[in-house]
């Protein structure tokens, strides 16, 4: 992993304090970069010492293509994939991932497949569901879950349970960043991990060492991005 301090990115706080980022390069592909901010960040399920900004990877053509190509190497030759379930706005990566998995190659188990790319919906109770028009792409299918970030694993686990409820067989979980190597026995392959970020801490809100030390929360984070406080 390469940290580049000479490529700053900045978030401006309401109180006048700026937060500068360092650029983190993936050890699996030098073309893949994310911006990493240090501070006190709160998500729905966890408090984290760093915020990994993966906006470019989800929305830039070249970066999304490179991310998909790198992730595809984990599934191309021994994991059948009929459907990719995309979370957190990862549909662009998902489309490229389907393309790379379906490439015509001698040893690829997914060669020339017409792979589906779908996104689940949240109902009024916050439960993940698939509408009737999408369920044929899940029922009895081999499914790969694509998620931007795995911290506590709760979102990945909910998606896993949802796919299994609809009769899908989860083959794996692909992520841009993951704290975990597996969720309920399903392996997680990621482009970045906590080992790439010195001092990275992720904990439940009740056990957050930064809260206990009286450190104020810098920003709220979710799959759409960051809101500075």
Could you tell me what each predicted segment is?
Residues 154-160:
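Conserved acetyl-CoA-binding loop-helix of GNAT-fold acetyltransferases
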Residues 15-80, 223-229:
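Active-site-facing substrate-recognition patch
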Residues 86, 145-146:
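Hydrophobic Val/Ile/Leu positions in short beta-strands of Rossmann-like dinucleotide-binding domains
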Residues 82, 141, 171:
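Conserved acidic residues
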Residues 91-144, 151-154:
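Short, glycine/charge-rich flexible loops or terminal/linker lids adjacent to PRPP-binding catalytic cores
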Residues 80-90:
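Short glycine-rich phosphate-binding loop at a beta-alpha junction
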Residues 17-28, 160-229:
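PRPP-dependent phosphoribosyltransferase catalytic core
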Residues 1-18:
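Short, Lys/Arg-enriched N-terminal segments with co-localized hydrophobic residues
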């Amino acid at each position: 992993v390469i940290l580049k301090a000479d490529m700053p990115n900045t978030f401006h706080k309401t109180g006048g304090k700026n937060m500068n980022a360092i650029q983190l390069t993936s050890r699996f592909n030098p073309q893949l970069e994310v911006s990493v901010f240090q501070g006190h960040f709160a998500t729905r399920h966890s408090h984290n010492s760093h915020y990994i900004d993966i906006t470019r990877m989800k929305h830039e053509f070249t970066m999304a293509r490179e991310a998909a190509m790198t992730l595809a190497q984990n599934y191309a030759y021994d994991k059948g994939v009929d459907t990719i379930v995309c979370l957190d706005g990862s549909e662009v990566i998902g489309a490229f991932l389907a393309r790379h998995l379906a490439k015509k190659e001698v040893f690829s188990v997914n060669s020339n497949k017409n792979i589906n790319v779908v996104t689940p919906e949240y109902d009024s109770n916050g439960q993940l569901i698939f509408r009737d028009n999408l369920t044929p792409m899940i029922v009895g299918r081999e499914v790969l879950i694509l998620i931007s970030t795995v911290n506590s694993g709760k979102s990945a686990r909910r998606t896993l349970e949802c796919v299994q409820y609809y009769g899908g067989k989860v083959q794996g979980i692909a992520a841009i960043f993951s704290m975990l190597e597996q969720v309920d026995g399903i392996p997680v392959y990621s482009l970045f991990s906590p080992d790439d970020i010195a001092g990275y801490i992720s904990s439940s809100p009740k056990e957050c060492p930064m809260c206990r030390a009286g450190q104020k929360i810098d920003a709220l984070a979710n799959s759409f991005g960051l809101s500075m406080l």
